[in-house]
C-alpha cells in the first residue's frame, strides 16, 4: 500500500465520459486546489534594490576607445550594425532587453578590441547576426533559425541586403563573440536598473523608457556612458510623459545613484534626439527613426561565407564550403542579388580553401 502511494503523483485523473456525471464536485475540487496553490514569489523589495544597484554599478565598464582605436572603423559602420540588430529584434518581436544585450555584445567585441573590420567591413553585419542570435538564446523562449532571422531583418529595397550568411559561418562568429565576452552573457544594461525599479506597477513608463533608449542605441555616444547614467536619464526624460516627477523620481534617481554630470549629459542627448524627431514628425523609437541607418554602410565584395538569399533555398548551396570565411577577399564586385541568385549557380569552392589565417585573434 505504501509502495503504491509513491506513484500516486504520476497518475492523471481521467475525464468522465458518461453524460450524467455531476461536475459540481469537480468544480469544488478545482477551487480547493486553487486556494491551496503556493503563492507566487514576492517582487523585489525596496530594501534589496540598494544592494542590487551597488553590485550593478561595480560591474559597469563604459567603453571609451580613442578615435583611432574604434574597431568598427567609423561611426557609420557602428550605426549600420546596431541598426540592423535593432531592426531584427523589432521584426521578430523580441524584448527590449534582447536588443540591449545584442548591442552590448557588439560594442564589447568591436570597441573592446577583440574584432576589427579592417578590409572586411562585412564582418560587422556577420557579428550583428551572431549577437542577435546569442541574445535571443539568452533572453527569449522561442528562437528562429538563423536563415529566418536574417531574412526577417532584410530591407528589400537595399541592394546590400540581398545576401545572408550560412549557418556554419554564423556559429563560428558566435564562438568568437563568446570568447570576446569571456562567456559572460549578462552585461549590465540600462534595463538592469529600470526593470526592477519600475516593474509591472509602472509598465507604461517602462515602455516609454525602453522606446527612448532603443532610439539612441545606434548613436555613437551610447557606449561612451554608463548604463546607470542612461537609466537615470530615461527616467528624467519620461517624467513629463507619464506624470512622474517630484519626490518619487528623486527617490528613484537616488537609488540608481548615477554620476550627476554623466546623467545630465545623457539627458541632454535624449532631449536633442526627441527634439529632432519631433521636428521631423517621427516618434522616438518608431520604425522610421533609423530607417536609413543600414544604407549608410555599403559592403564591398562578399566573403566566401556569404550566399545569395535565393540560393539559400537551393540544395546546392548547402554543400558550399564556409571554412574560408576570413580568407582573402574576392575581387571587388557586387553581392549576389536576389533575382540573379535564382538564375545563377555559384561554383563550389575548392576543397583547399579552408584557411584560418585571416581569422581575427581571440580576446586574451
Swiss-Prot record:
Q: Where is this chain compositionally biased, Low complexity type? A: 340-349
Gene3D superfamilies, A to Z: Cyclin-like
User: A biological process (GO) annotation for this entry?
Assistant: G1/S transition of mitotic cell cycle
Q: Name one GO molecular function term.
A: cyclin-dependent protein serine/threonine kinase regulator activity
Spans annotated as Disordered? 331-364
Q: Which GO terms describe its cellular component?
A: cyclin-dependent protein kinase holoenzyme complex; cytoplasm; nucleus
Superkingdom of the organism of origin: Eukaryota
Keyword annotations for this protein, in alphabetical order, are: Cell cycle, Cell division, Cyclin
Q: Could you tell me which SMART domains the record lists for this protein? A: CYCLIN
Write down a Pfam family by its short name: Cyclin_N
What family is it from?
A: Belongs to the cyclin family. Cyclin D subfamily.
| Full protein name | Cyclin-D3-2
Q: Which organism encodes this protein?
A: Oryza sativa subsp. japonica (Rice)
Q: Which taxonomic lineage is given here? A: Eukaryota, Viridiplantae, Streptophyta, Embryophyta, Tracheophyta
Amino acid at each position: 500500500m505504501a509502495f503504491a502511494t509513491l506513484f500516486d503523483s504520476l497518475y492523471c485523473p481521467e475525464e468522465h465520459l458518461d453524460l450524467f456525471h455531476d461536475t459540481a464536485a469537480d468544480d469544488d475540487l478545482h477551487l480547493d486546489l486553487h486556494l491551496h496553490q503556493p503563492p507566487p514569489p514576492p517582487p523585489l523589495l525596496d530594501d534589496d534594490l540598494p544592494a542590487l544597484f551597488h553590485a550593478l554599478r561595480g560591474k559597469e565598464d563604459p567603453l571609451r576607445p580613442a578615435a583611432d582605436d574604434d574597431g568598427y572603423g567609423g561611426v557609420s559602420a557602428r550605426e549600420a550594425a546596431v541598426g540592423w540588430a535593432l531592426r531584427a529584434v523589432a521584426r521578430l518581436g523580441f524584448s527590449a532587453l534582447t536588443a540591449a544585450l545584442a548591442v552590448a555584445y557588439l560594442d564589447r567585441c568591436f570597441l573592446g578590441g577583440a574584432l576589427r573590420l579592417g578590409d572586411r567591413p562585412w564582418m560587422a553585419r556577420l557579428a550583428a547576426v551572431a549577437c542577435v542570435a546569442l541574445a535571443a538564446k539568452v533572453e527569449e523562449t522561442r528562437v528562429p533559425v538563423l536563415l529566418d532571422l536574417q531574412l526577417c531583418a532584410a530591407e528589400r529595397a537595399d541592394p546590400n541586403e540581398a545576401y545572408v550568411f550560412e549557418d556554419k559561418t554564423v556559429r563560428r562568429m558566435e564562438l568568437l563573440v563568446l570568447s570576446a565576452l569571456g562567456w559572460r552573457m549578462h552585461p549590465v544594461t540600462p534595463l538592469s536598473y529600470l526593470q526592477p525599479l519600475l516593474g509591472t506597477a509602472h509598465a507604461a513608463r517602462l515602455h516609454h523608457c525602453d522606446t527612448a533608449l532603443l532610439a539612441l542605441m545606434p548613436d555613437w555616444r551610447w557606449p561612451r556612458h554608463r548604463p546607470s547614467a542612461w537609466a537615470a536619464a530615461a527616467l528624467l526624460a519620461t517624467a513629463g510623459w507619464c506624470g512622474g516627477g517630484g519626490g518619487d523620481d528623486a527617490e528613484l534617481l537616488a537609488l540608481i545613484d548615477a554620476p550627476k554630470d554623466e546623467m545630465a549629459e545623457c539627458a541632454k542627448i535624449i532631449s536633442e534626439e526627441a527634439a529632432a524627431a519631433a521636428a521631423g514628425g517621427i516618434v522616438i523609437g518608431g520604425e522610421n527613426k533609423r530607417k536609413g541607418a543600414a544604407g549608410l554602410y555599403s559592403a564591398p565584395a562578399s566573403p566566401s561565407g556569404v550566399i545569395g538569399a535565393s540560393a539559400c533555398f537551393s540544395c546546392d548551396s548547402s554543400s558550399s564550403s564556409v571554412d574560408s570565411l576570413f580568407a582573402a577577399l574576392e575581387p571587388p564586385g557586387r553581392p549576389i542579388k536576389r533575382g540573379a541568385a535564382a538564375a545563377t549557380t555559384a561554383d563550389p569552392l575548392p576543397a583547399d580553401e579552408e584557411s584560418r589565417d585571416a581569422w581575427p585573434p581571440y580576446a586574451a
